[in-house]
Amino acid sequence: MPDKETTRIETREYASSPCCMQEVIPRYGTELIQPDAWADVAPWRKAERKRLIDERLAVDAEGRKVKSEKIASRLDLTIGKVSGRIVSGYWPFRGEPDLRNWAIKVIERGGRIALPVVIQKGWPLEFRVWGPGDPLERGIWNILVPSHGPSVQPDVVIAPVVGFDDANYRLGYGGGFFDRTLAAMPKRPFVVGVGYAGSRIQTIYPQPHDIPMDVIVTDE
């Protein structure tokens, strides 16, 4: 995960400004929005997603480093003991908090780190064990993933958020991978959303398929 690490790499929108959803859906809030309202919610989410990603990409490298370190400290308090547990992390993408050094410390404290891998669009994620020096390849969206390694069921899932609300619903990239994966897992892990405090929104207008995180950890 550190920059000095040697990594083998194999290379195998109704864009509009966010609308006033309280006018589109009068009873807005954290209750589930019914599927027939999806035609209104989907373009709103797309616009909100773009706004939030643009905002976090505008943060400079030093600012992102400071925010990531604060999130890492709060993760330690939230998760507690990691020895003997499998924690699913992620490889940072598009300005997400960089928790790679924190993941290495999890391994040093007796835990195991797994990274999510997209096997095929529309399928649940696979979690592969990763450690420093293990070979990586570019997966979907050009994100680095373990090129091989055992598939495991994590005890803790760290899910980066684009946005989040007070009910712990996560706004992601729109692929539905985390929701699909959590719904398919035989035993629910402890699910921690991580993101910047500025990514908080009033509601994501949750749909029946949206699964809330157990907790959201931010830099504030």
Question: Which residues are covered by each model-predicted region?
Answer:
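N-terminal active-site beta-alpha-beta segment that forms phosphate/nucleotide-binding
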Residues: P2-V152
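Conserved phosphate- and dinucleotide-binding cores of soluble alpha/beta proteins
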Residues: K4-E5, I9-Y14, P35, W123-E220
